[in-house]
Amino acid sequence: MLDLTYEAPKPKVIAGAKHDWELVIGMEIHAQVSSNAKLFSGASTTFGAEPNSNVSFVDCAMPGMLPVINEFCVAQAVRTGLGLKAQINLVSAFDRKNYFYPDLPQGYQISQLYHPIVGEGEVLVELAPGIARLVRIERIHLEQDAGKSIHDMDPNLSFVDFNRTGVALMEIVSRPDIRGPEEAAAYVAKLRQILRYLGTCDGNMQNGNLRADVNVSVCRPGQYEKYQETQDFSHLGTRCEIKNMNSMRFIQQAIDYEARRQIAILEDGGKVVQETRLYDPDKGETRSMRSKEEAHDYRYFPDPDLLPLEIEQGWVDEIAASMPELPDAKKARFMADYGVTDYDANVLTAELDAAAYFEEVARGRDGKQAANWVINELFGRLNKQGLTIADPPVKAGQLGGVLDLIASGEISGKMAKDLFEILWTEGGDPAEVAAARGMKQVTDTGAIETAVDEIIAANPAQVEKAKANPKLAGWFVGQVIKATGGKANPAAVNQIVAQKLGL
């Protein structure tokens, strides 16, 4: 595992007009379960389908239609819990969360308030090389997503698309362990990375498949430590919840604004009202949405249509045995097996496809060289052209072939970059392309010696300077490489020049 040095969470300190204040943040992440069918029906979960085309009788609450649990969604929740080192509850239960809204046809949401499927876990968030913050997970529960209300299609009417209704969500609830906007964004990024590695959520925030509700409060220095001692949340101040955040940048902006808003109220002698707020990215501010409800406002009660969900430890063990290598373990292995730096390992493991690409290139080759080419040449070009690692123009096998030609001395580093450019635009086998384009280095020492002798004979003054100052021998190396059209092997040229000059 990673060799990480833990330190006490350093809070974001905001200077008010009268006092210093500290931030306290807890998050509820709504992650859409990667599943072809919904949580309690067989309707499709395909994104972007025609409005109301992925709706079953269960989803639209037709009379007499009963929910049937999707076993795969349950397995995905268990897999997520295991990935977060969490307690898997072998017995859980579903409850009805009652509220009325046009995009909720049942008049209630099926959720898990009292007995969630996953208990306490943790997420390790690396904030700097060797420094990590441990964010505790309070619980993960399964619930239904709601539909989508559309208000901008007609000036007088609102429309509802029920395609999303009943899609399985995992609500991942953290403890108030996050102490700043940057930490909050890093936590969401790390959680999304883990979910993608597990294959339990695609983490696509643009499509709403990963959304964050952010609870923000401010307190005076020293109050957080009192909370840690007593577990009394009153020490943390009154929290406000910012709903449905779907951007790392907006999460940071919203937290910063909300903290300053609360500080201004408190320093003016007022009280922060516990409420739900929305973030307006155009104005860069949060605004009130509704007063914050408590659990009793939703009149939760056990869903009479669903028996308690009982799973066997043997089934959990089977899922555990099929778990993939997760980001932290993969990073540690890359550093140990391939000798890459902490920074490079972070870049290479950020996405599963990137890690797989690198490993195919690096296997049996110089790991540091492979990392350099993947990060600087491949990723640099992908970013420049707005492409993704999922379908790169230069495949891992091709890049590996380029590195093999460098290792064998057949091409130089400069030739390799030219070859990479050709492969990017035209494709082909690296060795065949290099041969066809006459890109192979001159390694024949006889030919190199002839070129060196000619350059030395034509430049006697430069020879004397080089003998007086050996660093000037590089001039001869450059001239020889230039004379051979860039094809002479630099290492061989260096050796022969030094020998001829008696250095």
UniProtKB/Swiss-Prot annotation:
Key word Protein biosynthesis present: yes
Listed A to Z, the keywords are:
ATP-binding, Ligase, Nucleotide-binding, Protein biosynthesis
Select a single GO molecular function from the record's annotations and give it: ATP binding
- What's the EC number here? 6.3.5.-
Gene Ontology annotations of biological process type: glutaminyl-tRNAGln biosynthesis via transamidation; translation
Q: Mind telling me which residue stretches traverse the membrane in this protein?
A: none
Q: Which residues form a coiled coil?
A: none
**How would you classify this enzyme at the top EC level?**
ligase
Q: Which reaction does it catalyse?
A: L-glutamyl-tRNA(Gln) + L-glutamine + ATP + H2O = L-glutaminyl-tRNA(Gln) + L-glutamate + ADP + phosphate + H(+); L-aspartyl-tRNA(Asn) + L-glutamine + ATP + H2O = L-asparaginyl-tRNA(Asn) + L-glutamate + ADP + phosphate + 2 H(+)
Query: InterPro entries attached here?
Result: Asn/Gln-tRNA_amidoTrfase_suB/E (IPR017959), Asn/Gln-tRNA_Trfase_suB/E_cat (IPR006075), Asn/Gln_amidotransferase (IPR018027), Asn/Gln_tRNA_amidoTrase-B-like (IPR003789), GatB (IPR004413), GatB_C_1 (IPR042114), GatB_Yqey_C_2 (IPR023168), Gln-tRNA_amidoTrfase_suB_CS (IPR017958)
Q: Does the keyword Nucleotide-binding apply?
A: yes
- PROSITE patterns (alphabetical): GATB
Q: How does it assemble?
A: Heterotrimer of A, B and C subunits.
Among HAMAP family, the record links this protein to: GatB (MF_00121)
Instruction: Provide the function of this protein.
Output: Allows the formation of correctly charged Asn-tRNA(Asn) or Gln-tRNA(Gln) through the transamidation of misacylated Asp-tRNA(Asn) or Glu-tRNA(Gln) in organisms which lack either or both of asparaginyl-tRNA or glutaminyl-tRNA synthetases. The reaction takes place in the presence of glutamine and ATP through an activated phospho-Asp-tRNA(Asn) or phospho-Glu-tRNA(Gln).
- Give the record's family classification: Belongs to the GatB/GatE family. GatB subfamily.
| UniProt protein name | Aspartyl/glutamyl-tRNA(Asn/Gln) amidotransferase subunit B
Q: What is the lineage of its organism?
A: Bacteria, Pseudomonadati, Pseudomonadota, Alphaproteobacteria, Rhodobacterales
